[in-house]
Amino acid sequence: MASAAVQNKTPRKVLKKSTRDSLIAYSFIAPNFIGFCVFTLVPMVFAIALAFCAWDGRHAIEFVGLKNFVKLFTTDKIFQAALKNTIVYVIGTVPLTLACSLAMAVLLNQNVKLRNFFRTVALFPYVASLVAVAAVWNMIFNPSMGPINMILNQFFGVAAENLPRWAAGKDTAMITVILFSVWKNMGYYMVIYLAGLQGCNPDLNEAAELDGANRWQQFWHITLPQLRPTTFFVVIMLTISGFKVYDQMYMITQGGPGTATMTVVYYIYNVAFVNTPKYGYASAISMVLFVLVLIVTIIQFRGSKGEN
């Protein structure tokens, strides 16, 4: 009887202990989950609902259906220009940053003198204040007094009237911002590639060298395939950050000249917070951007699975 009583009590103790452990676990998760709901989930749901409405923050919310989306793709020339500029920016920054960061990582993964110093120098633009870095960049590419145009004029014979205006020129502003973004971000992705290179198997390179493969063949056929997971991560991060670009445009060109560097996120900010607020219309633009980024990311994931 005593043993039976002990057996009957034991499951209750185990149940109580498991319940207590679950409550402790949920208590650790709860703050993060509550923060996610309050600051991410609820605003997202509200933004989706607001995309089908017109609201300036002062008057009552008015349901307008698909009117905001119809306007975006039919009569809003600024949005269409911003969408085009954003796509151009992504196409320009992703491959350039990828190539530069990978090249730097491969070079600084070798046993060279002052390797750690050069790694730090390469990372400095990324960790430095964007305001300070943008100020230096504007000074370097100043159309009239910048050292780049001075070199072009004095050493390459480019006439003063033919010198590029860089951030102030309609045709060169986007190029300037793309170069700035590549220079600023390639140090960060270099570090990611360095971590990936540390995980590569050196025995494969040694075996290939014994078989007569040169450095380029070893890199192309052995090292690069081992870096596919790292490259996939870098491409995804660069693509998402490219579609969300705002800071660089604000600090370098303020979206100009005209709409030459106006991006979707910069336009969302202008619609929502500059002059007369149009929160419903800004939410509609945000939904379009979200769907676009989601589609591009899904395509990249499926492409990666196909390669694997």
Describe each region flagged by the PLM.
Residues 1-10:
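Short, intrinsically disordered terminal tails adjacent to the first/last structured region
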Residues 9, 18-308:
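A structural signal for multi-pass alpha-helical bundles of membrane permease subunits
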